């Protein structure tokens, strides 16, 4: 490949070359547009819309539209797009990923395809990683769009539904991935179509696309309601875990991030919890509590994986070091950590709606993204999202010097060397940015610098409010900044006066991240737009990556050299070994995400069926024919179940049949049983259906057609929502237990597909039965009205219950590495009704003989 690339250029270089004729067309329009008055320039927008209405395509008007945006940007923002930014904009319009280095002006690049696609009137979503960036970009770029006659909206956490609806109705809408995803889920929980806020998903431009579509893709978005399980047992399990001794009672597998009881540990559990056999299926819930207590105490680290703030356990994002307020680990792990830390334990919640980012973003008609680092994950973008990555050349050549890694034998020696290096740079006034992988490490470096009297600012999850402010000053003379990973991403570091002469911003990485992309992001903070700069990674053999994934060969080399504590070696072999370790971890993480997607694809097909059904009901379509079709299905199912001809007395079969159907859709005394004696099953079905249809026609006369249509919609919505929520719960339990199938040499994803499909069919059958039963028994004086079947209590981007987020069957509860919570009956939130009171559904029966049978 190297030789071919040398001769023909890389794929990106060839694609960029193909854009050049269009760039020339845009540049040729420059002079003409400069002569236009502001009013004449603004008039271009309605002219473009008219041309689109007359049959021209977006591609036809692209050169002119881009040229108009460029001229307007120069007038309104004082910034004119470079040729490279025009290239980036064209790649985004084509539905691809533009890899553009830090400082190349990605925010400005997005205005080109956003304006062009905004002309269609179908909406453009620009997706950012946090509310601050969404507000900032909408405010700044909104001036440009407003000048050109397009509207801009922003979606942030605190907006109410009316404000959200208004923002989504704008031509261009900025917002975070979480907000867009949650609004989609909420729109599919509404009971009136007017409550929806989103329009159909048209075109998304995802900023920091690697962070959103890859780093965050391991964890689903979940809207939840209050569960009913007690939290007391988490405390008991925590007390038990704290008494255990490592290696004697349990073992730790750091690579898989799993903790498992030894035989001695199992014996202690049996004594403590007074059970004969800990491994028995009846103790599956006990195993679940103990597994999570072990993980909380021995795999999850405070100030690395999570923080305790104001009596609350808050997850720390492993990629950015940011606090993930409002997110919780799933599967009871969060409760186990709360027990470990002695803070208030929140109840486990019940999932009302859920989706992964992979499946949410794949629903857009066109998807594109931009980032400084995507090429290392090119395969994943192509395989999962059908997106290819095009590297856009920098406007000026990169002048940053990337030094080889320095390898130390101990962690302490490395940190001392980092502090000395910072002290040297600070003495001459060169600004330094020190990147760490955790809050813990940030504080260690900070304390070393304090001892040396070096003034510095610390940017980590604890101070994330001042993030943009701190990072924007990091390039000033004499400034030393310690940042957890990529905190502050999205804010440019501009060099202060006299810093260029000192060599620009110096980057020091204190550890290699398990993803090469994160390391490249840290490096990319220096040397923006052709500025000078340098970067060096300081590594020790005690670092997590080296300890867990590094080879013994490296340790052997370093030990032979007999290095002093603060001595380091530079070695290509070591750098290569580190890169191989990173590739290994990246490959493993890709497999995990692929497996997660395999599971969610099953749910996705089911979700589409349910949401389509809801949408049809909400749109006010006449569902009478569907109700009658459901009725016929129920009758056919009952006839084929009970009338088999196997019983000696056919009357016994008919008796069972009538008992089953009278409860659902056949009125007592309306069927003459002897008349069915000599009929085939098909004829029996037709006869019974005719009887049911007549009964329903009578019901329609009693209610009035219009009123019954609304009752049908109410009942169908309620049945769909109740059964779907219970189904989500059941599928979740299935997923947790399915990993055990790998012991039987069965692919867990295939087993999940098959069993999940059966469960879905059962749910559809249950929806039909409940809908038909309620409609055939509803009485005019207690006709039901539309109400939500469950109230949302939280919208969380749920964290996987493992820090390494393994897929089902990979050392998580339910996989070979640990027991499962097992398929327990889903928690149901039913209003408390007396068993002998009339059922609130309007059937006229006692609660215990109607809906109360399910409770």
Swiss-Prot record:
CDD domains from the xrefs? DEXDc_SecA (cd17928), SF2_C_secA (cd18803)
EC number(s) stated in the UniProt entry for this protein: 7.4.2.8
Bias (Low complexity) ranges: 801-811
Q: Assembly and partners?
A: Monomer and homodimer. Part of the essential Sec protein translocation apparatus which comprises SecA, SecYEG and auxiliary proteins SecDF. Other proteins may also be involved.
**Cell location:** Cell membrane; Cytoplasm
- The residues the record assigns to binding Zn(2+) are 839, 841, 850-851
| Segments of this protein annotated with the region Disordered | 794-845
Key word Secreted present in the record?
A: no
Name the UniProt record assigns to this protein: Protein translocase subunit SecA
Q: Looking at its record, which EC class is this enzyme?
A: translocase
GO terms assigned for molecular function: ATP binding; metal ion binding; protein-exporting ATPase activity
Please report the record's description of how this protein sits within the membrane: Peripheral membrane protein
- The residues the record assigns to binding ATP are 85, 103-107, 492
**To which protein family does this belong?**
Belongs to the SecA family.
Q: What is its main location?
A: membrane
Kindly list the GO CC terms recorded for this protein: cell envelope Sec protein transport complex; cytosol; plasma membrane
Cofactor binding notes: May bind 1 zinc ion per subunit.
**Catalyzed reactions:** ATP + H2O + cellular proteinSide 1 = ADP + phosphate + cellular proteinSide 2
> InterPro entries from the xrefs?
Helicase_ATP-bd, Helicase_C-like, P-loop_NTPase, SEC_C_motif, SecA, SecA_CS, SecA_DEAD, SecA_motor_DEAD
Q: Which domain of life is it from?
A: Bacteria
Entry keyword set: ATP-binding, Cell membrane, Cytoplasm, Membrane, Metal-binding, Nucleotide-binding, Protein transport, Translocase, Translocation, Transport, Zinc
A Pfam family hit = P-loop_SecA
List GO BP terms, alphabetically: intracellular protein transmembrane transport; protein import; protein targeting; protein transport by the Sec complex
Q: What does this protein do?
A: Part of the Sec protein translocase complex. Interacts with the SecYEG preprotein conducting channel. Has a central role in coupling the hydrolysis of ATP to the transfer of proteins into and across the cell membrane, serving as an ATP-driven molecular motor driving the stepwise translocation of polypeptide chains across the membrane.
* Keyword Nucleotide-binding set for record: yes
* Cofactor list: Zn(2+)
């Amino acid at each position: 490949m190297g030789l071919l690339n040398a001769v023909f250029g890389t794929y990106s270089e060839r694609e960029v070359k193909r854009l050049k004729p269009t760039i020339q067309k845009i540049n040729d329009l420059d002079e003409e547009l400069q002569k236009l008055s502001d009013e004449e320039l603004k008039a271009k927008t309605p002219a473009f819309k008219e041309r689109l209405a007359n049959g021209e395509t977006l591609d036809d008007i692209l050169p002119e539209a881009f040229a108009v945006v460029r001229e307007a940007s120069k007038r309104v923002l004082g910034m004119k797009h470079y040729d490279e930014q025009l290239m980036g904009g064209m790649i985004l319009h084509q539905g691809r990923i533009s890899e553009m280095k830090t400082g190349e002006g990605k925010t400005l690049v997005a205005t080109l395809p956003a304006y062009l696609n905004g002309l269609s009137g179908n909406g453009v979503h620009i997706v950012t990683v946090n509310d601050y960036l969404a507000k900032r970009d909408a405010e700044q770029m909104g001036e440009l769009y407003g000048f050109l006659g397009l509207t801009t909206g922003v979606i942030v956490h605190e907006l109410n539904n009316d404000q959200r609806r208004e923002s989504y109705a704008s031509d261009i809408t900025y917002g975070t991935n979480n907000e867009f995803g949650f609004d989609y889920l909420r729109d599919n929980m509404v009971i009136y179509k007017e409550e929806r806020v989103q329009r159909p998903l048209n075109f998304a431009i995802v900023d920091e696309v690697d962070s959103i579509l890859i780093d965050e893709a391991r964890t689903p978005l979940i809207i939840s309601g209050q569960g009913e399980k007690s939290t007391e047992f988490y405390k008991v399990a925590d007390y038990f875990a704290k008494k255990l001794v490592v290696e004697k009672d349990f073992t730790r597998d750091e690579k898989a991030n799993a903790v498992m009881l030894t035989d001695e540990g199992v014996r202690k559990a049996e004594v403590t919890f007074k059970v004969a056999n800990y491994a028995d299926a009846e103790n599956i819930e006990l195993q679940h509590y103990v597994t999570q207590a072990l993980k909380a105490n021995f795999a999850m680290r405070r100030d690395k994986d999570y923080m305790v703030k104001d009596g609350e356990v808050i997850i720390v994002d492993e990629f950015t070091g940011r606090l993930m307020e409002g997110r919780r680990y799933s599967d009871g792990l969060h409760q186990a950590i709360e027990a470990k830390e002695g803070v208030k334990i929140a109840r486990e919640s019940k999932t009302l709606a859920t989706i992964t980012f992979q499946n949410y973003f794949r629903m857009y008609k066109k998807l594109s993204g931009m980032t400084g680092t995507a090429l290392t994950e090119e395969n994943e973008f192509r395989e999962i999202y059908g997106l290819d990555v095009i590297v856009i050349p920098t406007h000026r050549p990169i002048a940053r010097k990337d030094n080889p890694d320095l390898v130390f034998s101990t962690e302490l020696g490395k940190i001392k060397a980092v502090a000395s290096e910072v002290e040297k740079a600070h003495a001459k006034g060169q600004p330094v940015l020190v990147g760490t992988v955790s809050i813990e490490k940030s504080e260690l470096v900070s304390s070393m610098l304090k001892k040396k009297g070096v003034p510095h600012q610390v940017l980590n999850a604890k101070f994330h409010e001042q993030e943009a402010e701190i990072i924007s000053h990091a390039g000033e003379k004499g400034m030393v900044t310690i940042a957890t990973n990529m905190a502050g991403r999205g804010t440019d570091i501009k060099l202060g006066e006299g810093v260029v002469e000192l060599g620009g911003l110096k980057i020091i990485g204190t550890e290699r991240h398990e993803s090469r992309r994160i390391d490249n992001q840290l490096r990319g903070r220096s040397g923006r737009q052709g500025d000078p700069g340098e970067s060096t990674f300081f590594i020790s053999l005690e670092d997590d990556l080296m300890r867990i994934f590094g080879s013994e060969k490296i340790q052997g080399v370093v030990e032979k050299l007999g290095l002093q504590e603060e001595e380091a070696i530079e070695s290509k072999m070591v750098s290569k070994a580190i890169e191989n370790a990173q590739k290994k971890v990246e490959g493993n993480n890709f497999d995990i995400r692929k497996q997660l997607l395999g599971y969610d694809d099953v749910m996705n097909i089911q979700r589409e069926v349910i949401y389509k059904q809801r949408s049809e009901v909400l749109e006010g379509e006449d569902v009478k024919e569907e109700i009658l079709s459901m009725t016929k299905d129920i009758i056919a199912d009952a006839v084929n179940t009970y009338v088999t001809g196997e019983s000696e007395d056919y009357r016994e079969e008919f008796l069972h049949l009538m008992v089953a159907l009278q409860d659902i859709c056949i009125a007592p005394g309306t069927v003459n049983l002897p008349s069915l004696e000599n009929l085939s099953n098909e004829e029996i079905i037709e006869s019974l259906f005719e009887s049911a249809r007549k009964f329903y026609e009578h019901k329609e006369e009693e209610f009035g057609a219009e009123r019954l249509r609304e009752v049908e919609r109410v009942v169908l919505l309620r049945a769909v929502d109740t059964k779907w929520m219970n189904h989500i719960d059941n599928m979740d339990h299935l997923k947790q237990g399915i990993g055990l199938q790998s012991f039987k040499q069965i692919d867990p994803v295939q087993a999940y597909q098959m069993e999940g499909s059966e469960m879905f069919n059962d749910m559809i059958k249950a929806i039909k039965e409940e809908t038909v039963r309620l409609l055939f028994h509803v009485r005019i004086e207690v006709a039901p009205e539309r109400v939500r079947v469950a109230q949302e209590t939280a919208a969380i981007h749920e964290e996987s219950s493992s820090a390494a987020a393994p897929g089902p069957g990979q050392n998580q509860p339910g996989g070979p590495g640990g027991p499962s919570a097992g398929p327990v009956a889903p928690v149901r939130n039913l209003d408390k009704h007396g068993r002998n009171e009339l059922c609130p559904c309007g059937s006229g029966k006692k609660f215990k003989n109607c809906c109360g049978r399910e409770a």
